């Protein structure tokens, strides 16, 4: 049995096909979703979406949004997303280093919040690019 997974950003569809299982980063922690999962609606955190296709795991970097799960269908609406395989690890690492420097230099509450969000996005991209599918 499978799940139909659809991951959408405001500009494009990132994923739309059947999967065996997912592990989703939510605002209250990670949840695993298998076929016949209880209906759920949840906020999606900045983090990794792990997708299992048979014996292979793929990753997507998600930049926050919402997910609806029910009737073996998962719809995830996010601000932005990238497939881990599309992310250049060196570029992602450079972006992380810049984000860390910007957080150290941040002054004022707003700058610190924005720098912290940029750092979380950069860490997520690095993690997604470094994940090896098995």
UniProtKB/Swiss-Prot annotation:
GO cellular component, one term: proton-transporting ATP synthase complex
Organism of origin: Spinacia oleracea
Lineage: Eukaryota, Viridiplantae, Streptophyta, Embryophyta, Tracheophyta
Name recorded for this polypeptide: ATP synthase epsilon chain, chloroplastic
NCBIfam families (alphabetical): ATP_synt_epsi
Domain of life, per lineage: Eukaryota
Family the entry assigns: Belongs to the ATPase epsilon chain family.
Role: Produces ATP from ADP in the presence of a proton gradient across the membrane.
Membrane topology, from the record: Peripheral membrane protein
Alphabetical list of PANTHER family matching this protein: ATP SYNTHASE DELTA/EPSILON CHAIN (PTHR13822), ATP SYNTHASE EPSILON CHAIN, CHLOROPLASTIC (PTHR13822:SF10)
One BP term from GO: proton motive force-driven ATP synthesis
Cellular localisation: Plastid, Chloroplast thylakoid membrane
Subunit note: F-type ATPases have 2 components, CF(1) - the catalytic core - and CF(0) - the membrane proton channel. CF(1) has five subunits: alpha(3), beta(3), gamma(1), delta(1), epsilon(1). CF(0) has three main subunits: a, b and c.
Gene3D superfamilies according to UniProt: 6.10.140.480, F0F1 ATP synthase delta/epsilon subunit, N-terminal
UniProt entry keywords in alphabetical sequence: ATP synthesis, CF(1), Chloroplast, Hydrogen ion transport, Ion transport, Membrane, Plastid, Thylakoid, Transport
GO molecular function, one term: ATP binding
InterPro entries: ATP_synth_F1_dsu/esu, ATP_synth_F1_dsu/esu_N, ATP_synth_F1_esu_C, ATPsynth_dsu/esu_N
């Amino acid at each position: 049995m499978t799940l139909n997974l659809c991951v959408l950003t405001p500009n494009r569809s990132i994923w739309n096909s059947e999967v065996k299982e997912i592990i989703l980063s939510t605002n209250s922690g990670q949840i695993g979703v298998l076929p016949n999962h209880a209906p759920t609606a949840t906020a999606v955190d900045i983090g990794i979406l792990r997708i299992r296709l048979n014996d292979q795991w793929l990753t997507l970097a998600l930049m926050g949004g919402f997910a609806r799960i029910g009737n073996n269908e998962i719809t995830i609406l996010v601000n932005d997303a990238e497939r881990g395989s599309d992310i250049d690890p060196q570029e992602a690492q450079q972006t992380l280093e810049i984000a860390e420097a910007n957080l150290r230099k941040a002054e004022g509450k707003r700058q610190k919040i924005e720098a912290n969000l940029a750092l979380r996005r950069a860490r997520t991209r690095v993690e997604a690019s470094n994940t090896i599918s098995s």
